[in-house]
A protein has these predicted regions:
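Active-site cleft segment of glycoside hydrolase catalytic domains centered on the general acid/base Glu
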Residues: 1-9, 13-14, 28-40
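Charged, glycine/proline-rich intrinsically disordered loops and linkers
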Residues: 1, 40-60, 187-208
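Glycoside hydrolase catalytic-domain groove-lining segments
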Residues: 18, 24, 39-40, 44-141
Length: 216
């Protein structure tokens, strides 16, 4: 309800103030996608917080007035290594891309696209870091870190091609430059004092090394 009200407010404001209308959306991510993922089911209540399939937000449930011509589009941050179901579910990991290789990212995108049929799907974030540290492994090599810059470019080109092949509306690559202020569980306990983290570039930290342009 809150998300619908915020989009409604934005559309009304733009229409009445500027006499213009643009498509609207909000950013969603994989743990809130509308599909059921059996690899995420955890029956033990004590560790239920690790179940990334408990709640869903479905773009197809939102409806707009005929007076709002541009309409709503679906927007997701999608990374090929998290949550685990994106590379563990058989239908994703067995998907073959146009190079003849198994490609779990493409498999997930096709599933997400079909679940949002009739709605443009924008991949609002995707990418891989070129850090020394690796904070999340993927069975098909799309790790969250542990890549050289050359490997980062290679895998990123595969992800970009996948977005096109799955007929998405487009993709926003994450990201242009490295972000020195980011923290990551892999190294955060060793970055002391924490408030000085932004003053130096930590090559062990995956979150600081998504950029395709180094700032050093």
């Amino acid at each position: 309800v809150f998300l619908a009200k915020m989009m409604d407010y934005l559309v009304h404001y733009e229409t009445q103030t500027f006499l213009k209308q643009h498509p609207v959306s909000f950013v969603n991510w994989l743990p809130l996608d509308p599909m059921y993922h059996n690899y995420e089911f955890i029956d033990n209540e004590k560790i239920r917080e690790y179940d990334n399939d408990l709640v869903s937000i479905d773009f197809t449930k939102f409806q707009s007035s005929e007076l709002f011509v541009p309409d709503i589009f679906a927007s997701y941050h999608v990374y090929p290594y998290y949550p685990d179901y994106i590379y563990m579910e058989e239908k994703y990991r067995n998907t073959i891309n146009n190079k003849g290789n198994n490609d779990n990212f493409l498999g997930y995108l096709k599933d997400l696209k079909s679940r949002n049929a009739g709605i443009p799907l924008l991949i609002a974030e995707y990418g891989l870091p070129s850090s020394r540290g690796n904070s999340h492994y993927s069975t098909q090599g799309f790790h969250q870190g542990g890549h050289s810059e050359l490997e980062q470019a290679h895998f990123s080109s595969i992800l970009t091609t996948d977005i096109h092949e799955s007929a998405c509306a487009g993709g926003l690559y994450f990201e242009w430059t490295d972000e020195w202020y980011k923290h990551n569980w892999l190294v955060m306990d060793f970055q002391q004092p924490a408030e000085r983290r932004k003053l130096w570039h930590n090559m062990e930290n995956p979150e600081q090394n998504y950029g395709i342009l180094a700032v050093e």
